[in-house]
């Protein structure tokens, strides 16, 4: 009887909004890195058939040319669609406590169109910042 091989699949696709300003920097080895976090909302009906909202947060990371190119376009509130793979990290912190993190290594990122209300709010914020300067 042939051995059944399970495929190794590690793919993720998410759409959401950046919840903070991304952190762009060059690493000691010269690699460009962009880190951020997105919020993904899910609506569902509970047992009483009432609509509920659930929000999940995911750390994302981009490298090299993609990081450099998107660093100026991505800001808090930017809607994005990403595809990539999950990568886990474990370490011990300064108190010798075990820590664990899963982040999305982004392969493709598409900035989604903002709706008119978002654009109007951003324009008001930009105008306010200019007036304050």
Enumerate the predicted regions with their spans:
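Acidic, gly/ser/pro-rich intrinsically disordered tails
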Residues: 1-10, 24-29, 45-50, 72, ...
């Amino acid at each position: 009887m042939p051995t059944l091989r399970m495929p190794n699949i590690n793919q993720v696709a998410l759409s959401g909004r950046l919840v903070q300003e991304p952190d762009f920097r060059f690493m000691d080895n010269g690699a460009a890195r962009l880190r951020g976090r997105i919020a993904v909302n899910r609506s569902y009906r509970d047992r009483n058939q009432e609509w509920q909202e659930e929000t999940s947060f995911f750390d994302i990371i981009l490298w090299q040319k993609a990081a450099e190119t998107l660093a100026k376009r991505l800001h808090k509130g930017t809607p994005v669609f990403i595809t990539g793979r999950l990568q886990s990290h474990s370490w011990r912190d300064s108190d010798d406590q075990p820590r664990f993190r899963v982040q999305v290594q982004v392969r493709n990122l598409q900035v989604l169109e903002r709706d008119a209300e978002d654009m109007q709010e951003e324009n008001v914020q930009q105008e306010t910042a200019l007036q304050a300067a």
